[in-house]
Structures are given as structure tokens and as C-alpha cells.
Amino acid sequence: MASLQALRGTRDILPPETQVWQWIEQTAREILGRAAVQEVRTPIFEQTALFERGIGEATDVVGKEMYSFRDRGDRSLTLRPEGTAGTVRAYIEHGLASQGGVQRLRYTGPMFRYERPQAGRQRQFHQLGLELLGTADARADAEAIALATQILQALGLKNLRLDLNSVGDACDRAAYRQALVDYLTPYAADLDPDSRDRLERNPLRILDSKDERTQAIVAEAPSLHDYLSERSRQLFEQVQQLLTHLGIDYRLEPKLVRGLDYYTHTAFEIISSDLGAQATVCGGGRYDGLVSQLGGPETPAVGWAMGLERLVLLLQQGQAVPPATLDFYLVSRGAIAEGQALILAQKLRSAGFGVELDLSGSAFGKQFKRADRSGAIACLVLGDAEAEQGQVNLKWLQSGEQQTLDQSELLQDSDHWRSRLQAARTVSPVEVAPL
């Protein structure tokens, strides 16, 4: 019988790599929380029509990449390929617009697209997203970008570049679309196959083709900026001014278009020069028409999503990641000691300490080796002799220093031991398995 393994394009995330994921998520949660952003959790699968209407039937995501199926009720369902459409559906369904003000929402979770697996791109991948719904103010665009850069900086990531563009409103894009088609049509035979297919369905996507021959043709194409309305120009200028005031560097990239049809006005990507072909770690922009397009009230909005796999890849390249908070590794040997060790572990955890209890029942030597590999700051050693005296041996794993103390001393003077543990704690890189 063939062995059962994870499907191509999916992967298991195991310790210690999970520590990296938790650190990314915790960092984002803290930063966004300070900006009054609240979490929303939406279903992993939705009606297929949600993505067809929201993302756009002419997009590659809808046309080629979605995992769609029919359930036993003969309903067409799809595993979510991105997070914004589901968040907007929830915003409409639960009447969040009627609460007034700006809804500041975030999400984290798995997404699904049928793509060729490669480093930083899986068929099941994870995104962290931010959505600010209910404001057309340029400050929202700047704040969204500022929060994204703050998260990436807090993770210690370097060699990042912010690319910025405006894709205008629907009227701007319609005029530009025709001009682009008129320009590209004489070159149709010279375009790569994907771009030839997009020429009729979604010509703006040709602008970010990776084919060198197509890029050379596109380099001389009309500029979208020449087709922006006065209002679109003013909004884009305001966003640029605000980013400058915030001290956020950016590069204007007139060929930048996002792969989803709902974007309007501001579009941006944060690019890492330390990644290969999959260099975008965060992408987003404004989507003023999506809420009404999905049946809700006219609602301007802006948001972004980060690819967690790509952040992990960057952190794998040498960035130090805080280890899991494990204070003590508790080893025991003997009938009395083993029972008492369980009680001591629970009491220490209740006092706020991180404790791993060795449950192997093996000799002390083997337990000590596991303690050395555990990442704990100190090892607590309990034999029957110590248990009968209500004592425990403490060994600081980094220095090798040892001492014997009463168990009650650990519990009653917890602040002292917490400060000792903190002083001994060091930040060390966590091994991350290749993606």
C-alpha cells in the first residue's frame, strides 16, 4: 500500500518552525491591535459566485487557479483564493456598515490556488490581511501602508522596496484599457501566449508580464497616469505626500497593476530583493467599488495582504527569532519524585512559568540530553531524595551553575526567579525547514 503523504503544493509546518509563524502572527497582532484593528474569521469555503463577482471572471485566479467543487446539494463552492472577498461578504451580511465610522479588520489563515509549487508559492498558502472599510480619505491608504511597513520592520526585515501606483477609477481604466489594446494589437503575434490570451480578456495584466519580449513591447506602451482624472491625480498626490511626511520611501511604478479586478486608485507592493521570482511580500490597494459590487452600500475601502510563507523564507535567511518561552525543563526519576514532579509542574505553570515535564521515565542521563535540546533556560531535577525533603535541584543550562532549593521558594518568590530567567534568556536563531 502506498504511503500517505501531504499533497503536492501543501506542506506540514512543524516545530521549531512553528515558532517563527507564531512570532510573525504575534508581532502583527500587537502592532495592528495598537491601531484598533480587530480580527475577523471567515469560512475557508464560500459560494463560487462570491469570487467570480468580486475578483473578476477574467482574472487568472478565477479562470485558472480556484479550487471549486459541487457539494451534495449541487451548490458550487470554492476554497477561498484570497481573504478580501470573504471579509467584504461578512461586512455586508452582518450590517457592519450601519455601525458607522471605519471598520478596521484583520484576518489570518490559509488560502488555496492551483499554481505550480515553488519556493514561496504553494497551493495552500497563508495570508495575513488588513482591511479598512468605510473611508475614502487618503490618510487611510497611508495608514495601511505604514502599518504594513511597521510590521515588516518589527520583524527585522531589510532590503525591502515599496512600489506605488494609481490604477485610477473605473472610467480612467476603461479609457486606458482601450488605448492599451490599440497599442498592443499590432504586436499580438509577438506577445507571449498568456499575454495574447489577456489582450481581449484582461489587457492591464499584460503590464506585469515576466516575459522579456513582452516587457520590451510594454515598455513603450501608453502610461496609465496620462488617463487619470483630476480627482484620481489629487488622491494619488495626497497619498504620496502623506507617505513622505511619514518618512516612508517609495518608488513610483507606473506599470504596477494588481492581479485582482477590484482595485481602484492606490495600488502598492512591498518587494524583497532577498527573494527570487516570488519577491512580493505584501500587496494591496484601494477597492472602492467592491462592497457595492457584492450587494452592499457604496463603501470606499483599502487593504493589503502579506504572504506568510515568504516572510518565513526571509526570516530563514539569518534573522534571529525569539525562541519559545520555556523556562524550565523538569526531569524526575523514582516513584515519589515522578508523582511530585507532575504537581510541581502544574503549580509552576499556574504561577506563570513555562515548564516542560519529561514523561519518558528514562534514566537521568537521557532526560538531561533532552533538557539541553529543549531550549529551556534551566533544568529542574527531582529524585526521590529531593522529593521527600520538598526540595529540587536547579541547573542553569547555559552556565552549568547548580543549586538546591526548597520547592516552595520557587513558588513563593516567583518574581525573583522570573527576573533571573529573563536575565539568562538570549535570542537565538530558530532552524526553519526549507519551503
From Swiss-Prot:
<dbReference type="InterPro" id="IPR004516">
    <property type="entry name" value="HisRS/HisZ"/>
</dbReference>
<dbReference type="InterPro" id="IPR004154">
    <property type="entry name" value="Anticodon-bd"/>
</dbReference>
<keyword id="KW-0648">Protein biosynthesis</keyword>
<dbReference type="GO" id="GO:0005737">
    <property type="term" value="C:cytoplasm"/>
</dbReference>
<keyword id="KW-0030">Aminoacyl-tRNA synthetase</keyword>
<keyword id="KW-0963">Cytoplasm</keyword>
<keyword id="KW-0436">Ligase</keyword>
<dbReference type="GO" id="GO:0006427">
    <property type="term" value="P:histidyl-tRNA aminoacylation"/>
</dbReference>
<dbReference type="Pfam" id="PF03129">
    <property type="entry name" value="HGTP_anticodon"/>
</dbReference>
<dbReference type="InterPro" id="IPR036621">
    <property type="entry name" value="Anticodon-bd_dom_sf"/>
</dbReference>
<dbReference type="InterPro" id="IPR033656">
    <property type="entry name" value="HisRS_anticodon"/>
</dbReference>
<dbReference type="GO" id="GO:0004821">
    <property type="term" value="F:histidine-tRNA ligase activity"/>
</dbReference>
<dbReference type="InterPro" id="IPR015807">
    <property type="entry name" value="His-tRNA-ligase"/>
</dbReference>
<dbReference type="InterPro" id="IPR045864">
    <property type="entry name" value="aa-tRNA-synth_II/BPL/LPL"/>
</dbReference>
<comment type="similarity">
    <text>Belongs to the class-II aminoacyl-tRNA synthetase family.</text>
</comment>
<dbReference type="InterPro" id="IPR006195">
    <property type="entry name" value="aa-tRNA-synth_II"/>
</dbReference>
<dbReference type="InterPro" id="IPR041715">
    <property type="entry name" value="HisRS-like_core"/>
</dbReference>
<comment type="subunit">
    <text>Homodimer.</text>
</comment>
<keyword id="KW-0067">ATP-binding</keyword>
<keyword id="KW-0547">Nucleotide-binding</keyword>
<protein>
    <recommendedName>
        <fullName>Histidine--tRNA ligase</fullName>
        <ecNumber>6.1.1.21</ecNumber>
    </recommendedName>
</protein>
<dbReference type="Pfam" id="PF13393">
    <property type="entry name" value="tRNA-synt_His"/>
</dbReference>
<dbReference type="GO" id="GO:0005524">
    <property type="term" value="F:ATP binding"/>
</dbReference>
